[in-house]
Amino acid sequence: MTKTTKPKEKAAAGGAVIGSGSGLGSVTKAGGGSLLSNAADSKIRTAKSNNNKRQAGRAATALAATTTASALAATTTAGATGSNAAANETEIAIETENGEAATPTAAATAAAANLSSLESARSQALTSVVSETARQAVTTANASATSTSTVTAATEIATATASDTAATSEAAIDDDPSAINTNNNNNNSKAQNDASESVKTKVISYHQSEDQQQQQQQQAQIYEQQQQFLSQQLISHHQQEQHQQAQQQQHQQVVQEQHQASWLAYDLTSGSAAAAAAAAAAASHPHLFGQFSYPPSHHTPTQLYEHYPSTDPIMRNNFAFYSVYTGGGGGVGVGMTSHEHLAAAAAAAAAVAQGTTPNIDEVIQDTLKDECFEDGHSTDYHVLTSVSDMHTLKDSSPYALTHEQLHQQQHHHQQQLHHHQQQQQQLYHQQQQQQQQQQHHHHHNNSTSSAGGDSPSSSHALSTLQSFTQLTSATQRDSLSPENDAYFAAAQLGSSLQNSSVYAGSLLTQTANGIQYGMQSPNQTQAHLQQQHHQQQQQQHQQHQQQQLQQQQQQHHHNQHQHHNSSSSSPGPAGLHHSSSSAATAAAVAAATAAVNGHNSSLEDGYGSPRSSHSGGGGGGTLPAFQRIAYPNSGSVERYAPITNYRGQNDTWFDPLSYATSSSGQAQLGVGVGAGVVSNVIRNGRAISAANAAAAAAADGTTGRVDPGTFLSASASLSAMAAESGGDFYKPNSFNVGGGGRSKANTSGAASSYSCPGSNATSAATSAVASGTAATAATTLDEHVSRANSRRLSASKRAGLSCSNCHTTHTSLWRRNPAGEPVCNACGLYYKLHSVPRPLTMKKDTIQKRKRKPKGTKSEKSKSKSKNALNAIMESGSLVTNCHNVGVVLDSSQMDVNDDMKPQLDLKPYNSYSSQPQQQLPQYQQQQQLLMADQHSSAASSPHSMGSTSLSPSAMSHQHQTHPHQQQQQQLCSGLDMSPNSNYQMSPLNMQQHQQQQSCSMQHSPSTPTSIFNTPSPTHQLHNNNNNNNNSSIFNNNNNNNSSSNENNNKLIQKYLQAQQLSSSSNSGSTSDHQLLAQLLPNSITAAAAAAAAAAAAAIKTEALSLTSQANCSTASAGLMVTSTPTTASSTLSSLSHSNIISLQNPYHQAGMTLCKPTRPSPPYYLTPEEDEQPALIKMEEMDQSQQQQQQQQHQQQQHGEIMLSRSASLDEHYELAAFQRHQQQQQQLQQQTAALLGQHEQHVTNYAMHKFGVDRETVVKME
């Protein structure tokens, strides 16, 4: 259809032939790649320059031949090129002939022939250049098929009426989705055609005679076939119209027959054997919908499948199941009868849903019980794809075509729809039914897995595909038809069928298929099964809405498909409601479906995965529909309960398939979405995020042109999966001890953002990814811990195990003796040590455990304090050396911060944070160092602590998680860019700010400048204020030694930061934020000055610097995030504040940065650890921030009141006033804190640095 449509358009333009010829070159180029195309173009140009004369002569010859040959001759001439492009061009030329006068047609045909020759030459050149022998072979195979089908399409277009044109478009689509895509690509290079004309002329001269003869014969055959097909389509169209009319009547009848049909719809469980038999019969008979006189030979099942690759195959698959209850199976394909059956099935579904609710409930229960693997389940899904759904799907099946085909068909439909909406809908129904007949058996065989996962009807394929792995296996999924494999990915069918199949439940398969049907015919009969009454209304709706939807679907087809998929997906009420055809209705129905399938969210595929439950984070608009789709499937989710296992096993690997399918399927508007949705259903999380991304892209309007690879690539999905579960694809349910749920959810978002960079979900996904990545980092640690713990728990409580030696059933670890018998840990170790079985007399009732000193003991605290102080000193020294470039280094170092160092630096500040809020500032400051050291050590050891500081910005945001969290995250993203992407992309300042804020979690003064810079939200400012106070304390503690320098630095920093704060506040646009920033600035300045002073003081210790210079380079760089110890934090703060100062204030950069001259930039590898730490850091920060928030709120209330009082119209004034007041307050506090903490800090620093330096240095190195 694409071929036909675009050629038609070009023919209408009069340059269709040339454009097509160019397009041919484009196609070839597209196949070969830009380089290949360029090489081919160069070759073509050379040949063209050499053969312009020849080309002119050849053009005349081709023109004469074409003119003489007539449309078929032209087609043959184009085919003579020997390339699909030639056929396409010829097809275009034929269309041009149809559209234009005989003479223009002849000229166009001649041009087309020339272009075809050129294109063939170009394609050959490209092929030779690209060495795409395989592609050329494929192209040749496609060329013959495409030439035939294209010629047929062209002939059809020439011969057929508008409806015939639609049929022709379908025929063109049938030719080859790749060919269609090729045509789409081919339409774009007149220049290329011209360039390749000489080559084409040569090629034509070489191939034209043979090709012309062959193509003439082929065209004659194709023309006959096309005519037959068109006549069949027309007949089918008329039949379809009659069927639709009859079906409407029948729907009413079906409503009456609902009880009878209900067994078809929902009681298939009881009639599963019959349904399976019918489905099997349908599957065995590719032309189960054989009423269409449509000759399959003319359009291979692949063509048919291609024609309606996504919806039809799914529909067919469902039809296979439906054939069970459609009576003639594929009755839909049968046309009126099938429609009647569909209506009956829909009525039955509706009756079941309404009057026969017990049946539905029973079916649902059975489905849930049978875990969607039994026939009943497939039957359920059969119901989902009830006949009416099938009808709807058929109507939408044109949309089910590959995205391009779908798009083109949609455009074609739009053109023809306006003229022949109903007719073409019917015609498409017929064609789709026909194709569904073949596809029915194809998909049926394959789709059996999809539609009849449980259903024996498709059981031959499904039985083999019974396992998720098989179902998801690319071969089986794409096995729908080998011809369709590549296309299959493009076809939603593959994704939905296979995804559905993957759900092992034909239930899910049918649900997904039904959803996709619904998705593809969002308005049509998605709910038909479940809503017979809705079906009747919606058939009218369908016809009405199908017309609208064919228009809308062209616009919103993908989106609606998504919505419809979501609702269709639901076996019951979701599908019913979803039947409403309007896109809005689809959305509402999706919501209603979610509501109706109350278990949709609750079922959550039984995975508890946010993805499953509502297609986790599917995003709004169509994406929610997606989610609903999954969750209508969710309705089946319980049925999928076993699928949980499958998901665990196949979810991840299936995700890539799903992604691939989705990506290719996405190309097919709803198909891709449906595939994603189905995949989502199958994968629960990943597919959903990917599908959501696809849906979001679709919602963005890219759906029409959703590039499968654009949103979901196998690598992207794998990356997302890896990010989600720490790369453990087979354990998607990552063992996130603390943030597993969030990590997973965020990971889902992350996957979404990864999958669909351009999708609507990306923004949310980005933040989700930021937290998700952090969560993942934390999760990976948690996973290991939890896995180890789970192993131990399972080992100690392994049911049925008893020691073969002492017969105990309780042990900390099960071992095996040389005989392989299980023995308890004691016996195993005893034997291992003594080589003698452990005497039973040694058996004890209790398990002897080594007495380990509990973590957090005073000794450890002192050690950690020493280490922290040493690290801080070393870091300060290294920062002194490293801080000069910290502005830049910190950016990279932020990203580069070592995971270990990060936890140290970040966690220490954060841990100190935790203690800070608890204690008064002086006490907090005093204890902060201790806490910094202690907590830092604990934080370093604790992934959460590690994550906490990293996410100190997040923590801030978490502190004010209500709105500030988002604001802060945004702020952090803008200023700090918490999101991994943002962090990576963050400017040095932002990076520094981010790190500073993170280190600020320990030492917030640097963070405060960052906050000041970032301070998008007052919350952030509040946090910064508290952080600044804390930082002031920390810095006072660390920098009291250098209080004078700190004061000087603070002055400089204050001035700069005030300016920065003013600008930041102006940026933040919130005077309160600005004032808060101003307030924060003094603290941050003080902190920065203190950090600078601390860095200067730390610089004194060259050894520490030398040791930590590298570590601190990373640490200081990571310093914002990674201050290892309070001292390290201080030095990090100094470096960070310096770096902030530097990057924020270059003038002060010199003054303050003299303290910190980074010797080397930290490697970027810290970025990932930083992100990894973020989840844990968020937790730590959230806890700390909750405390800090209280302090900050108090400070903010005081400061904010002062600021508010002192606020002036000028942000600068606000900043200055706030900064001045804040600075004064902070200075006073700092002085007090310094007085109180100076001694302690100096002592701690001295003690830590002095006696701990050697040990700590080693420790720091080790920690690093």
UniProtKB/Swiss-Prot annotation:
<feature type="compositionally biased region" description="Basic and acidic residues">
    <location>
        <begin position="1"/>
        <end position="11"/>
    </location>
</feature>
<dbReference type="GO" id="GO:0001228">
    <property type="term" value="F:DNA-binding transcription activator activity, RNA polymerase II-specific"/>
</dbReference>
<feature type="region of interest" description="Disordered">
    <location>
        <begin position="841"/>
        <end position="867"/>
    </location>
</feature>
<protein>
    <recommendedName>
        <fullName>Box A-binding factor</fullName>
    </recommendedName>
</protein>
<feature type="compositionally biased region" description="Low complexity">
    <location>
        <begin position="1024"/>
        <end position="1048"/>
    </location>
</feature>
<dbReference type="GO" id="GO:0007391">
    <property type="term" value="P:dorsal closure"/>
</dbReference>
<feature type="region of interest" description="Disordered">
    <location>
        <begin position="523"/>
        <end position="585"/>
    </location>
</feature>
<dbReference type="GO" id="GO:0007390">
    <property type="term" value="P:germ-band shortening"/>
</dbReference>
<feature type="region of interest" description="Disordered">
    <location>
        <begin position="1"/>
        <end position="25"/>
    </location>
</feature>
<dbReference type="GO" id="GO:0003700">
    <property type="term" value="F:DNA-binding transcription factor activity"/>
</dbReference>
<feature type="compositionally biased region" description="Basic residues">
    <location>
        <begin position="555"/>
        <end position="564"/>
    </location>
</feature>
<dbReference type="GO" id="GO:0007516">
    <property type="term" value="P:hemocyte development"/>
</dbReference>
<dbReference type="GO" id="GO:0016239">
    <property type="term" value="P:positive regulation of macroautophagy"/>
</dbReference>
<dbReference type="GO" id="GO:0008354">
    <property type="term" value="P:germ cell migration"/>
</dbReference>
<dbReference type="GO" id="GO:0007435">
    <property type="term" value="P:salivary gland morphogenesis"/>
</dbReference>
<feature type="compositionally biased region" description="Polar residues">
    <location>
        <begin position="1008"/>
        <end position="1023"/>
    </location>
</feature>
<feature type="compositionally biased region" description="Low complexity">
    <location>
        <begin position="422"/>
        <end position="438"/>
    </location>
</feature>
<dbReference type="GO" id="GO:0045944">
    <property type="term" value="P:positive regulation of transcription by RNA polymerase II"/>
</dbReference>
<feature type="compositionally biased region" description="Low complexity">
    <location>
        <begin position="447"/>
        <end position="459"/>
    </location>
</feature>
<dbReference type="GO" id="GO:0035050">
    <property type="term" value="P:embryonic heart tube development"/>
</dbReference>
<dbReference type="GO" id="GO:0000122">
    <property type="term" value="P:negative regulation of transcription by RNA polymerase II"/>
</dbReference>
<dbReference type="GO" id="GO:0001223">
    <property type="term" value="F:transcription coactivator binding"/>
</dbReference>
<dbReference type="GO" id="GO:0005634">
    <property type="term" value="C:nucleus"/>
</dbReference>
<dbReference type="InterPro" id="IPR039355">
    <property type="entry name" value="Transcription_factor_GATA"/>
</dbReference>
<comment type="function">
    <text>May function as a transcriptional activator protein and may play a key role in the organogenesis of the fat body. Binds a sequence element (5'-[TA]GATAA-3') found in the larval promoters of all known alcohol dehydrogenase (ADH) genes. Acts as a homeotic gene downstream of the terminal gap gene HKB to promote morphogenesis and differentiation of anterior and posterior midgut.</text>
</comment>
<dbReference type="GO" id="GO:0007492">
    <property type="term" value="P:endoderm development"/>
</dbReference>
<keyword id="KW-0805">Transcription regulation</keyword>
<dbReference type="GO" id="GO:0042688">
    <property type="term" value="P:crystal cell differentiation"/>
</dbReference>
<dbReference type="InterPro" id="IPR000679">
    <property type="entry name" value="Znf_GATA"/>
</dbReference>
<keyword id="KW-0863">Zinc-finger</keyword>
<dbReference type="GO" id="GO:0000981">
    <property type="term" value="F:DNA-binding transcription factor activity, RNA polymerase II-specific"/>
</dbReference>
<dbReference type="GO" id="GO:0008270">
    <property type="term" value="F:zinc ion binding"/>
</dbReference>
<dbReference type="GO" id="GO:2000427">
    <property type="term" value="P:positive regulation of apoptotic cell clearance"/>
</dbReference>
<feature type="modified residue" description="Phosphoserine">
    <location>
        <position position="1208"/>
    </location>
</feature>
<dbReference type="GO" id="GO:0035167">
    <property type="term" value="P:larval lymph gland hemopoiesis"/>
</dbReference>
<dbReference type="GO" id="GO:0001710">
    <property type="term" value="P:mesodermal cell fate commitment"/>
</dbReference>
<feature type="region of interest" description="Disordered">
    <location>
        <begin position="599"/>
        <end position="627"/>
    </location>
</feature>
<dbReference type="InterPro" id="IPR013088">
    <property type="entry name" value="Znf_NHR/GATA"/>
</dbReference>
<feature type="region of interest" description="Disordered">
    <location>
        <begin position="899"/>
        <end position="1048"/>
    </location>
</feature>
<feature type="region of interest" description="Disordered">
    <location>
        <begin position="405"/>
        <end position="463"/>
    </location>
</feature>
<dbReference type="GO" id="GO:0043565">
    <property type="term" value="F:sequence-specific DNA binding"/>
</dbReference>
<feature type="compositionally biased region" description="Low complexity">
    <location>
        <begin position="565"/>
        <end position="585"/>
    </location>
</feature>
